[in-house]
Design a protein with these regions (language model features):
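A fold-level detector for beta-propeller and closely related beta-sheet-rich head/sensor domains
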Residues: 1-201
Length: 201
């Protein structure tokens, strides 16, 4: 059993614990996007820390540079890759104050079985509406064990972004893995205040 949490408005980071034994939890990993110093910090299960500069070559598996304020509660869900089911954490990249386009407007999928390394980052489109898009809301997950209507293995995820757009994100064995499909657009502007901060229900 894995517990994963972020710092909310307090930072741009997440950590994960193995709480299979509640009285003896084990640290799994943590990562932080330091936007002030333009650095990525990553801690593995042994507590070893890596410090990676934006200016150097950051491999995709450690590229958390789009992580904003960590509002999004991670969805721990099954994903099908190469006909194998694996458990991952998926979350939106968080809040950017509505003004900074450098981070926040993405969805992350990370490997819970390999120190939280990034499996995929998918960026959300930013339209011309005077809002710097981001995704502070948590994702909604629909899994095969949660509904008899599901004819797939893995998970479908749904998320709203700050600009009022709704997206479907595919982590199933049907269609294209990591496919991101727009399903609704509220056409948010600063004037109409249709911005989305919360999880869809």
């Amino acid at each position: 059993t894995v517990l994963m949490a972020g710092q909310g408005r307090g930072g741009h980071s997440y950590f994960a614990l193995d709480i299979t034994k509640p009285l003896a939890p084990e640290f799994l990993f943590a990562f932080e996007n330091d936007i002030m110093d333009s650095r990525i910090y990553h801690w593995d299960g042994a507590g070893n820390r890596q410090s990676l500069s934006y200016l150097s070559s950051i491999t995709d598996e450690y590229n958390y540079s789009k992580l904003g304020e960590s509002w999004s509660v991670p969805s721990i869900v099954p994903m099908v890759e190469n006909n194998t089911v694996k458990w991952v954490a998926a979350f939106a990249a968080g809040y950017n104050g509505g003004v900074n386009t450098a981070y926040g407007s993405s969805i992350y999928v990370i490997d819970l079985e390999n120190d939280g390394k990034v499996l995929k980052r998918v960026d959300l489109a930013d339209v011309n509406n005077n809002i710097a898009n981001s995704a502070p809301a948590s994702l909604v997950s629909v899994t095969a064990d949660g509904t008899s209507k599901a004819k797939y293995k893995g998970s479908l995820l749904y998320v709203a972004d700050l600009e009022g757009k709704k997206w479907k994100f595919n982590l199933t064995d049907k269609d294209t893995l990591y496919d991101l499909t727009p399903i609704f657009n509220a056409e948010a502007t600063v004037e109409n205040d249709r911005m989305e901060f919360y999880q869809m229900t």
